[in-house]
Swiss-Prot record:
Membrane topology term: Peripheral membrane protein
Disruption phenotype: Leads to deficiency in the import of proteins with the PTS1, but not the PTS2, targeting signal.
UniProt xrefs under InterPro entries: PEX5/PEX5L, TPR-like_helical_dom_sf, TPR_rpt
Function: Receptor that mediates peroxisomal import of proteins containing a C-terminal PTS1-type tripeptide peroxisomal targeting signal (SKL-type). Binds to cargo proteins containing a PTS1 peroxisomal targeting signal in the cytosol, and translocates them into the peroxisome matrix by passing through the peroxisomal docking complex along with cargo proteins. PEX5 receptor is then retrotranslocated into the cytosol, leading to release of bound cargo in the peroxisome matrix, and reset for a subsequent peroxisome import cycle. Required for PEX7 ubiquitination.
Sequence motif WxxxF/Y motif 2, residues: 128-132
Organism expressing this protein natively: Komagataella phaffii (strain GS115 / ATCC 20864)
Protein name, as recorded: Peroxisomal targeting signal receptor
Protein origin, superkingdom: Eukaryota
Protein keywords: Cytoplasm, Disulfide bond, Isopeptide bond, Membrane, Peroxisome, Protein transport, Repeat, Thioester bond, TPR repeat, Translocation, Transport, Ubl conjugation
A GO biological process held by the record: protein import into peroxisome matrix, docking
Residues of the signal peptide: none
Protein modification: A disulfide bond is created between Cys-10 and Cys-338 or Cys-444.
Residue span of region Disordered: 176-195
Region (Amphipathic helix 1 (AH1)): 11-33
Length: 576
């Protein structure tokens, strides 16, 4: 009973144990809030149990409360001892923490300006809330910004993005040792540690210099050998003769020529009224001069090359006629045969390059245009080969740039219209056309027209450039001019028909396309008797005619369109 005490000694103001408990538990709101439910349940249980106390128990409790003379237990010595123990524990730890924190900031500049992360002891935490309120709004704002301290500790970021010094075990062990030292010993140890680290860095630097010295000599030797090898290669390139440059160019040209479709041998028409005529070539020339159908002139030239397979001019004219007659494959096969017999034929080279562009074989076209420059302007080509004998590894853009520069140099030789080379302007226009630089293409083709205004081919090329440049009205004018100069120019009619379709003028498109197909007919030969090769060559015209009928909503006429069809059925509806 004496251990419990009695009377007023149980009050908090006079009970030393109660005062000690208040002192060490200044702010326990966080812990209490976590146990709030349990605390309330305990009170409820106490209130329920109070009504069940027996009369005997109540009498004993009254007797206990009436004891006034029993001395209370003296807690003053215990409180004094506890205070001494607490001060002895906190003071060295705080000194050690402050000393290590200051030393660490001096060693690491990344945390030199960081806020101190001090350990809060029970004594410090007693007045923390009061100190925080007195610190002012700046400190409170700073604390609010660090609600997620793991993202704002400089040491953590350095470990992730920097050298990771806080991740090493030696630093942690050193901190543990300094907690056991007094401030003077910590300072002495720090000075010794700093001197030792400086000496270690000096030794390490000296060893690294010794290790890197052989590498430096080896690198100098390797660099010298590389420079010497480069000199030898450059000297070998300079020693190449013009014949060797020519051989290299021929090799590259063959490479690009092999990259396009192999058109094979020329396929002749089975029915040809000129086959046994000894003057087939002259007949073909007269037909072209008189404005006859290109198909008839083509048959005459076919007969000429069949009679004399080495007739270069006949192969050239056959190729030109077939390309103008919208028979690209036959035209390319004839032109390639012409160049096989005469590799320097300028007309064949230019026409073949344009045909390659039409069929999408750009690199083959560039190589052919370079051959054209090499033939007509050998000085320009020779200087270009000396600086770069390759055709630049098949890169389409670089190859176009290289050949364009050659043609630009050739154009600079005769800037005046009176002395201008129309073929140079045509070649430049083709190069720009392949890169879809249609504004430059138009300028080049217009320049060629200034030199040769009566050449239907120039007007047709200008029309194609204008159409691709989204100028259909001007394109129609150019195509119309080409047809005025050569009414049997099938390609110009085909292009004109396409332009009318794009403009929504379907009836006019149909009439020009039907005219083009009719120009493929040969007098005395039924369309159904034409060879399969002839029918395939009409395919572009036929398919475009179907599109025009669909635009007119004449599906009844679409089924009547096929290669070798009779054209009489359309003459009552269309003027051609």
């Amino acid at each position: 009973m004496s251990l419990i005490g009695g009377g007023s000694d149980c009050a908090a103001g006079s009970n030393p144990l109660a005062q000690f408990t208040k002192h060490t538990q200044h702010d326990t709101s966080l812990q209490q809030s976590m146990r709030n439910g349990e605390f309330q349940q305990g009170n409820q249980r106490m209130m329920r149990n109070e009504s069940t106390m027996s009369p005997m128990e109540r009498q004993q409790m009254d007797q206990f409360m009436q004891q006034q003379n029993n001395p209370a237990f003296n807690f003053q010595p215990m409180q004094h001892e506890l205070n001494v123990m607490q001060q002895n524990m906190n003071a060295p730890q705080q000194v050690a923490n402050n000393s290590w924190n200051q030393e660490f900031r001096m060693k690491d500049p990344m945390v030199a300006n960081a806020p101190s992360a001090q350990v809060q002891t029970p004594v410090q935490s007693t007045n923390w809330a009061q100190d925080f309120q007195q610190a002012g709004p700046e400190v409170q704002h700073h604390a609010q910004q660090h609600q997620h301290p793991i993202l704002s500790v400089p040491g953590v970021r350095a470990g992730i993005y920097g050298g990771g010094r806080l991740m090493g075990g030696s630093m942690m062990n050193r901190a543990a040792q300094m907690q056991q030292q007094n401030p003077a010993q910590a300072q002495t140890s720090e000075q010794s540690q700093t001197q030792w680290e400086d000496q270690f860095k000096d030794i390490e630097s000296m060893l690294n210099s010794k290790t890197q010295e052989p590498k430096t000599k080896q690198q100098e030797q390797n660099t010298f050998e590389q420079v010497w090898d480069d000199i030898q290669v450059s000297y070998a390139d300079v020693e190449l003769t013009n014949d060797q440059f020519q051989a290299q160019w021929e090799k590259d040209f063959a490479q690009y020529a092999e990259g396009r479709l192999n058109y094979g041998e020329y396929k002749y028409e089975e029915k040809n009224q000129f086959r046994n005529d000894p003057d087939a070539y002259e007949i073909g020339m007269r037909l072209m001069e008189s404005g006859a159908k290109l198909s008839e002139a083509g048959l005459a030239f076919e007969a000429a090359v069949q009679q004399d397979p080495k007739h270069v001019d006949a192969w050239l004219k056959l190729g030109e006629v077939q390309t103008q007659n919208e028979k690209e494959s036959d035209g390319i096969a004839a032109l390639e045969k012409c160049l096989e017999l005469d590799p320097t034929n300028l007309a064949a080279l230019m026409t073949l390059a344009i045909s390659y562009i039409n069929d999408g074989y750009d690199n083959a076209a560039y190589a052919t245009l370079e051959r054209w420059i090499e033939t007509k302007y050998p000085d320009i080509a020779s200087r270009a080969r000396s600086s770069n004998p390759d055709l630049d590894g098949g890169d389409r853009i670089e190859q176009n740039k290289r050949v364009t520069e050659l043609f630009m140099k050739a154009a600079q030789l005769s800037p005046d219209v009176a002395s201008m080379d129309a073929d140079v302007q045509t070649g430049l226009g083709v190069l720009f056309y392949s890169m879809e630089e249609f504004d430059k293409t138009i300028d080049c083709f217009k320049a060629a027209i200034e030199v040769e205004p009566d050449k239907a081919l120039n007007w047709n090329r200008l029309g194609a450039a204008l159409a691709n440049y989204n100028k259909p009205e001007e394109a129609v004018e150019a195509y119309s001019r080409a047809l005025q100069l050569n009414p049997n120019f099938v390609r110009a009619r085909y292009n004109l028909g396409v332009s009318f379709i794009n403009m929504g003028r379907y009836k006019e498109a149909v009439e020009h396309l039907l005219t083009g197909i009719s120009l493929h007919e040969v007098e005395g030969v039924d369309a159904s008797e034409m060879s399969s090769n002839q029918g395939l060559q009409n395919n572009a015209l036929v398919e475009t005619l179907k599109r025009a009928f669909l635009g007119m909503n004449r599906r009844d006429l679409v089924d009547k369109v096929y290669p070798g069809m009779g054209l009489a059925q359309f003459r009552k509806m269309f003027d051609f």
